Amino acid sequence: MNKIDEFEVELGYIKDETIQEDCRTMIELLPDYFFLVPASSTGKYHPSYSLGEGGLLRHTKAAVRIGYELLQDPSIGDKYTSIEKDIMLMGLLLHDGLKLGIPREQYTRFDHPILMANYIMEHKADLLMSDEEIDLLCSVIKTHMGPWTKDYNGNEVLEAPKTKYQNFVHMCDYLASRKFLLVPFDDNNRISV
């Protein structure tokens, strides 16, 4: 499997060549399971298209497409610079990259937003983006769970979104997980509209 080919369309939404290249670097570093597992093992929190083999990949593509479409609306997109838009789209592409941890565990890691942000920081030397851009990227990934910041034992684990960037990425992920919003995919896991 060519991991980058899986995101050919989504990478095209990112305009800045440096951010696009860094996104490719991080896609190559995603664990193989990311491309194979469902977004939800129970189906409780995600629509039908994100279940089954490749479901997490499809959920991610839906979140990126939602972000891209919203940013095309001037009433939303004009609030962000072109670089900020690219970083948020990259954040959406990577937000669930370590959903089952690394190495892979059986169930979703509640702290997967932190794991992914830390993974990016571990590979910071391989990236071309500025420190400020990487910090923004990690911040939108760390807070993508929105108000759901407590683990199954009631411990406060995650940060809630505070900035407009963090809230935007959370909103796109949230919309991509709504059961009534069904995104059509073809047999190659590409959005078909």
Question: Which residues does each predicted region cover?
Answer:
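Acidic/His-rich, divalent-metal-binding segments that scaffold phosphate/diphosphate chemistry
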Residues: 1-104
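Aromatic-acidic/polar surface patches that form glycan- and anion
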Residues: 56, 109, 161
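Histidine-centered active-site/metal-ligand motif
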Residues: 59, 95, 112-113, 144-145
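An active-site-proximal "capping" alpha-helix that borders the catalytic cofactor pocket
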Residues: 63-67, 109-126
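Short, well-ordered alpha-helical segments in soluble proteins
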Residues: 67, 71-74, 101, 120, ...
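Histidine/acidic-rich helix-loop-helix segments that form or flank divalent-metal centers
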Residues: 79, 88, 128-191
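Short, low-complexity, polybasic intrinsically disordered segments
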Residues: 103-107, 156
